[in-house]
Amino acid sequence: PGLKEEYDRLAVEMIRRRKEGNGFNFFHFMIDLEGGPCVAKRLSGCGSGTEYLAVTPWGDLYPCHQFVGNEKFLMGNVDDGIVNTEIRDEFKCCNVYAKEKCKKCFAKFYCSGGCAANSYNFHGNINDAYDVGCELQRKRIECAIMIKAAMAEMEEEQNEEK
């Protein structure tokens, strides 16, 4: 709850400073309401286990760096390639449509179901959604939209004055 309140305070401060001509950006509040996130990322997030792999210094392959060392997620090695295709297939199905909590969430196409590693570490399942991450992501999107609305209002007022 405290972090969400701080996001609100930051958004209000960003609006105030932009009105004064001294604006700044915060990556998590940067949102494109017209184009949105790239299409591929809307469904499956980062692409762990399917679009990229983590390679250890010993040549072991894991779906992402956060799974390195967890033998359950060892996919293979650079010499033999991917030998555990079940893990790859599990990550192929890791998307907003596989996560029950995402189905009715307004933010699903901005977070794409969140981080598989966080879901696994929190729930023991990559196809669940990491609740804390979801709550914070939704709040960041709300703040981003609030900033966009305030800036549009400010621009409209400036145009009326001309």
What residue spans do the PLM features occupy?
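Flexible mid-to-C-terminal extensions adjoining Fe-S/redox cofactors in radical SAM and related proteins
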Residues: 68-162
